[in-house]
A protein has these predicted regions:
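N-terminal export/targeting leaders of redox proteins
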Residues: 1-75, 130, 248-418
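Sequence context of c-type cytochrome heme-c attachment sites
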Residues: 7, 15-196, 203-204, 210-233
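Amphipathic alpha-helical interaction segments
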Residues: 99-100, 235, 259, 416
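Noncatalytic linker/hinge segments flanking ATPase motor cores
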Residues: 117-124, 202-205, 244, 320-328, ...
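A contiguous, surface-exposed recognition patch within enzymatic or periplasmic domains that forms
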Residues: 200, 208-241, 245-265, 283
Length: 418
């Protein structure tokens, strides 16, 4: 128990020429080590499929089959949504559709191409997306012609699109069908594989390789290994079972107040010390997240115990703690790591003067900043903008605004003082 301290013609080397720009807050790093072309694949069927499916870099799709209609050939998520209506709606409102937003784009204007290429491995991994980004930013190796009809011109800004996970060489892949499928399906049907229901599929982008960046001896992103070491992981409860329940393409996590609240079990106990003093103790247990709460170095969660009068007005903070792994803005030093492992309990408590009268209570509040590290980093960058273009500053300000507006607050418990 923890006591809290208070396109086809584009070659695979498209984004390899350096531009010499400065790289600021580089958090992205491709996940588990991926094979390069010509390297032997693992013998385990899941590992073998994933190694081929996520070969680095992904090759262009190539020309679509002649019999494909424009909708069947298109890489646009909107085209997929013509038939996969619910999946498209879920994706459209998810964070996966925003992985190539202002928070990434302002940095691309300062990065060299190899660094940006590393980010796009997970944020916008298709070769066609890289080509469009190169066109937009004027990078070396950008295609000289317009994209083919099956590549929408905004594909690079749509983030982790359907095709990033489900399409290779215009062939569709997905989990095994739950019910029998029709004899004739659009886009020549699909190839089922169990890898889509295995946590290793998610590890491709949610687990840094052993050679990845470490702070205080710990990988910067270690979500898959945190899960593997947890009771849910050992029991075979996959990432998809929580974050894609019933195959919904929602991927809810720390940004979602309901999902975050469900990850915790809390109790609040009051003890009378004497006629004038009382003690409150809150126990907060990570019972629902199969990884650290929170995972990664970006989010921060602040818990507070508050004295509240009969009218519901706060009358004093009794105790506060931050649950997070905090690093400095340039990611060279871990400042602290107070996160809860799966199944771990933290205790927050303090003494207070017993109020007179009835109707007083103690409330346990949770304030979540899903992008806390980004907020600090982006604010720091805004203080050093002399080398930035006007458009870069605009994107940076929008990225900061988005990070700040993602915050939320939840009352987890209310205990009446008797």
């Amino acid at each position: 128990m923890k006591k809290f301290a208070v396109w086809t013609a584009v070659g695979v080397g498209l984004l390899m020429a350096a531009s010499g720009a400065h790289n600021f807050f580089h958090l992205s790093e491709h996940g588990q080590d991926r094979p390069v072309s010509g390297q032997a694949l693992p013998t385990d069927p899941i590992d073998g499929f994933l190694a081929a499916h996520w070969i680095d870099p992904l090759p262009p799709q190539g020309a679509p089959p002649a019999q494909f209609s424009p909708i069947e050939a298109s890489l646009a998520p909107e085209a997929c949504g013509q038939c996969h209506v619910q999946q498209y709606r879920d994706w459209r409102d998810s964070l996966h559709s925003r992985t190539a937003g202002p928070g990434l784009l302002w940095q691309f204007r300062l990065m060299d191409q190899p660094a940006a290429n590393g980010c796009m491995r997970c944020h916008a991994p298709l070769a066609e997306q890289k080509a469009l980004m190169a066109l937009e930013l004027g990078w070396t190796g950008a295609p000289s012609s317009s994209p083919p009809s099956y590549v929408p011109t905004n594909l690079h800004r749509q983030g982790l699109v359907c095709a990033a996970c489900h399409v290779r060489a215009h062939r569709r892949f997905g989990p095994p069908a739950r019910t029998p499928t029709a004899d004739r399906l659009p886009h020549a049907g699909f190839s089922p594989h169990a890898a889509f229901e295995d946590s290793r599929f998610c590890a491709v982008c949610h687990q840094f390789p052993e050679s990845g960046t470490r702070l205080n001896g710990k990988l910067l992103e270690n979500t898959y290994e945190e899960w593997r070491a947890s009771r849910p992981g050992r029991a075979g409860q996959t990432c998809q079972s929580c974050h894609m329940s019933d195959r919904r393409h929602l991927w809810r996590g720390i940004h979602d107040s309901e999902m975050t609240t469900r990850a915790l079990t809390v109790t609040v106990d009051l003890t009378v010390l004497d006629r004038e003093r009382m003690r409150v103790e809150a126990k907060i247990t990570n019972t629902g997240a199969g990884h650290y709460f929170p995972t990664y170095v970006v989010p921060e969660v602040v818990f507070t115990l508050q004295l509240v009068d009969p009218a519901g007005r706060p009358k004093g903070e009794i105790a506060r703690t931050i649950i997070a792994r905090r690093a400095n803005v340039d990611l060279t030093q871990e400042l602290f790591d107070h996160r809860l492992r799966s199944g771990e309990t933290g205790i927050l408590g303090g003494q207070f003067k017993r109020p007179a009268g009835t109707g007083w209570s103690i409330e346990l509040h949770m304030a979540v900043s899903p992008g806390a590290h980004y907020e600090r980093s982006f604010q720091y960058a805004l203080e050093h903008t002399a080398h930035m273009t006007r458009d870069t500053r605009r994107l940076l300000r929008e990225a900061l605004r988005q990070a700040e507006t993602a915050r939320y607050r939840v009352t987890l418990a209310r205990t009446v003082i008797h």
